[in-house]
Amino acid sequence: MCDEEFSETSTESEVSYEGATEVRAYRLRVESEVPLPLPAFKGGTGRTTVRITEGKVQFPSGADGNAAAENGSLYLRISNAGTFRIDGTSVTVNRSDSARDWNLSAALLGRVLPALLYSQGHLVIHGSAAAIGEAGVAIIGFKTSGKSSLAAGLYDAGHRTVADDAIVVNFDGGPSLVPSFPRLKLAEPTLGALDLSENAGDSSKEWWFPVDDGFEPTPVSLDSVFVLEESVDAASPSVAPVTPRTAMEALLRHAGSVDVVRATQTEERHFRECARVAEAADVKRLYRPDDLSQLPELARTVENALE
């Protein structure tokens, strides 16, 4: 099963899309010099206005990893996209020579804006999320585990998409899922398995698949977390409970960006926030066979686990 998360390698051919320079993402009003493949902002107010501009960014010399904090700014460098500086609600983009629009928009939406929100006190987890009835469900797992594919399966089953690629958790009250934007990053095998190819747009290895008709625009309580794993011997999907220790380890392991946590020296805060999620949400392990034709059954397994 293919997982449609942000990859640091460029796609084989440029993805064509009509980008907008004023959009809403993560409940933020985003004004961007880099066109983003989202619906244009149509009025109303976002929680905060974020401005993305192109300019010169010098990653701090001597810094380890792909994130650094210096003089109140947060720096990111992302292969095949560029170097980014976050100053409060301002983002400066220094695109690399090899950056294609697909890679740059994927980096901004999947890595940079979540890092900005992390710097403002939100928890960021790598994964996808959906609303099933009134329940908010997070799907976490390693790269290629099939998180986006399952999110697409849940969308196809009539459930609302909350986030893909990066899960942002707010702690005003109990943990809640912050809606990201009405797009899923899907590859052709998943689209074909769910008969969604006609709605995907121009062909390439991956698409920003529109889910405007099935997007949840308001925060949803984070009630369940599924740790998705492939089981080569499994004939059908299954769910298993996990210990509190295993739940905590899974949440820590799938942090949105370990480099950002380390660069900002917020390990203790990150640990406390993961502990709050582990305590508040029902965490289970979800096993899936390596068979895209079972996506509908995988979605039903999630539904049944919530009953």
What are these regions (language model features)?
Residues 77-135:
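Extreme N-terminal, non-catalytic leader segments
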Residues 154:
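Aromatic pocket-lining residues of Rossmann-like dinucleotide-binding sites
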Residues 150-151:
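Post-Walker A alpha-helix
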Residues 146-147:
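Conserved glycine(s) of the Walker
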Residues 2-33, 39, 128, 132-142, ...:
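Glycine-rich, often acidic-flanked micro-motifs
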Residues 7, 61-63, 68-70, 89, ...:
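Residue-level signal for well-ordered alpha-helical segments
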Residues 1-100, 300-307:
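Long, basic/Gly/Ser/Thr-rich N-terminal segments
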